[in-house]
């Protein structure tokens, strides 16, 4: 198993009772986690001092208590920078556990003896796109949500990659792949 253990700006502080206590840069968040099934006494003061807490609704969705939380903040991972902010369904725009995959992709790109092109589908806020571009790949970033692609562009910018060879596409991934698959079929 690979573990995302190179973070300085992210830390799982405690978990249990269906929740996790995390440090995101300087922000302490409490978010639901259905896999944290054991009980916890919540003795860690961080539980009470969290700047943001997401409350899941029994009817779906939920809401943030975030009076002490900035509207957005930056997180750094190695030589990458990402914008984070509380959004619907407990998310912040970044999945820290995916850092091992960014590292794996970067290692392969840097070891290649040829130019590398990456197609990142369902690319969300672009962490993988930014990581691959930072290592020299040309990237095609595809997500159906215009707001997510705009956020990904901002992540590229704050990572010093505003002019990197990243093609930003707002489209349904199946729509993007259909012409490619048709061309491939025609070529045999």
Place the predicted regions along the sequence by residue.
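N-terminal accessory targeting/assembly segments
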Residues: 1-4
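Non-catalytic substrate-recognition/targeting regions of SAM-dependent transferases
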Residues: 6-22, 29-96, 103
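Conserved alpha-helix/loop element of class I SAM-dependent methyltransferases that forms part
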Residues: 96-113
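Conserved class I S-adenosyl-L-methionine
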Residues: 113-124
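A generic structural signal for alpha->beta connector loops
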Residues: 115, 136, 163-165
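Conserved SAM-binding loop of SAM-dependent methyltransferases across substrates and taxa
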Residues: 125-137
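Conserved SAM-binding motif I beta-strand of class I
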Residues: 138-143
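S-adenosyl-L-methionine
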Residues: 145-188
